[in-house]
């Protein structure tokens, strides 16, 4: 069965790349910063949940509360399911609404086992994932301000995390290694054509400056060209 979360996940991942590139091109407004964090968090969460689904790991979700016999049967069917992608794909919207999915902080706790051999020995992405969670919580649930949300250092960390996470997407293997539909990326090697929007084989940033990004932006260069032509 085709992974059920990936269409949504790829939309979010492609959006995160666009907003990341926009910020690097000097569009450092709060709107772009919020959308970058939101899209990246959404993509990472969905992809990690998809990994759990592809490995038929039932920790991915739970029935909220068993209220009647139908709910009890749904719970039993869930734990008996051997193809979680197919199980969730065939549920009605009403039954889907009865599930709570795993929380992001729990995904952080599981990430080393979940990513498996895609991580180097002793490697951890806990710091980066916790930063992403903190920024997402702040922009969703509490006060943020232009100039203080997503610092230059934080943007640098998340940019470089995206490079590492994309490598994980490239190399991650499901338990059933022979089922190629269960791999995360729908292509091998460098993406081409329509898939090119998902690639993130970039060079890591050693530092980042919003001011420098604005000065070096396409718009600033265009204005400079117009002024110099007079």
Task: Spell out what each predicted region is.
Residues 1-42, 47-55, 189, 205-213, ...:
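Charged alpha-helical initiation segments
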Residues 4, 31, 35, 124-127, ...:
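A structural signal for alpha-helical segments
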Residues 8, 15, 39-42, 128-138, ...:
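Charged, amphipathic alpha-helical oligomerization/scaffolding segments
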Residues 18-21, 48-53, 137-145, 167-178:
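Charged/polar positions within long, soluble alpha-helices
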Residues 18-24, 110-118, 140-142:
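Short, charged/polar, low-complexity loop and linker segments
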Residues 28, 55-65, 180-184:
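Short, glycine/acidic-rich hinge or "gate" loops at secondary-structure transitions
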Residues 60-130, 134-135, 145-146:
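Flexible secondary-structure boundary motifs
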Residues 127, 131, 144-230:
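Polyanionic, low-complexity intrinsically disordered segments
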């Amino acid at each position: 069965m085709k992974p059920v979360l990936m269409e949504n996940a790829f939309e979010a991942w492609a959006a995160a790349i666009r907003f990341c590139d926009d910020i690097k091109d000097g569009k450092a407004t709060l709107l772009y910063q919020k959308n970058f964090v939101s899209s990246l968090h959404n993509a990472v969460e969905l992809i990690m949940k998809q990994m759990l689904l592809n490995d038929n790991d039932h920790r991915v979700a739970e029935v909220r509360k068993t209220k009647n016999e139908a709910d009890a049967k749904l719970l039993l069917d869930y734990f008996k399911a051997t193809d979680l992608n197919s199980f969730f794909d065939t549920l009605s919207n009403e039954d889907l609404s009865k599930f709570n999915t795993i929380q992001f902080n729990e995904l952080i706790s599981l990430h080393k086992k979940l990513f498996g051999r895609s991580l180097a020995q002793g490697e951890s992405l806990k710091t980066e994932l916790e930063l992403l969670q903190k920024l997402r919580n702040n922009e969703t649930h509490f006060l943020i301000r232009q100039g203080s949300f997503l610092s230059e250092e934080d943007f640098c960390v998340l940019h470089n995390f995206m490079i590492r996470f994309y490598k994980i997407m490239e190399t991650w293997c499901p338990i059933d290694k022979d089922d190629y539909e269960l791999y995360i990326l729908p292509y091998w090697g460098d993406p081409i054509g329509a898939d090119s929007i998902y690639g993130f084989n970039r060079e890591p940033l050693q530092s980042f400056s919003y001011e420098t990004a604005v000065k070096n932006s396409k718009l600033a260069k265009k204005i400079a060209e117009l002024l110099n032509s007079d």
